[in-house]
């Protein structure tokens, strides 16, 4: 297996808190979350700020691993963060993200998230 793409992102949780405080939280949520994520948001076990911060960070990392960032038709909502029964994070690729991933001939994806009081960090790796 060889690495096809790597993306990493670190995010200040205070940045997300400021967005929410400035009454932009709902608009921001609708911009970065998929329909599935919007539906689970009210029932999330994490606090609202960390929920958004983790998703924003992992989607930024994934867009970097795809080699484009959020452009060329790729939207934040084309990526969904999920967790398996053990809590291990994984991504679902929808619409444009799915097309881009297939064009890279990606066979395996790896996701890791870490969050502390002030920061969230995400890394995404694609392999053939």
Curated annotation (Swiss-Prot):
It is an enzyme of class 2 (transferase). One of its GO terms (biological process) is fatty acid biosynthetic process. It is found in: Cytoplasm. Keywords: Cytoplasm, Fatty acid biosynthesis, Fatty acid metabolism, Lipid biosynthesis, Lipid metabolism, Magnesium, Metal-binding, Transferase. Its cofactor is Mg(2+). Mg(2+) binds at residues 9, 60. Belongs to the P-Pant transferase superfamily. AcpS family. NCBIfam families: acpS, pantethn_trn. Transfers the 4'-phosphopantetheine moiety from coenzyme A to a Ser of acyl-carrier-protein. This is Holo-[acyl-carrier-protein] synthase. It comes from Buchnera aphidicola subsp. Baizongia pistaciae (strain Bp). The gene is acpS.
């Amino acid at each position: 297996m060889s690495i096809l793409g790597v993306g990493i992102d670190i995010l200040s949780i205070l940045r997300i808190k400021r967005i929410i405080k400035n009454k932009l939280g709902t608009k921001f949520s609708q911009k970065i979350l998929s329909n599935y994520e919007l539906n689970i948001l009210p029932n999330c076990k994490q606090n609202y700020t960390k929920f958004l911060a983790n998703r924003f960070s992992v989607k930024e990392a994934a867009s970097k691993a795809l080699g484009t960032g959020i452009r060329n038709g790729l939207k934040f909502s084309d990526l969904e963060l999920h967790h398996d029964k053990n809590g291990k994070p994984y991504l679902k690729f929808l619409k444009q993200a799915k097309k881009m991933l297939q064009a890279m001939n990606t066979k395996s994806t790896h996701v890791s998230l870490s969050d502390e009081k002030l920061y969230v960090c995400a890394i995404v790796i694609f392999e053939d």
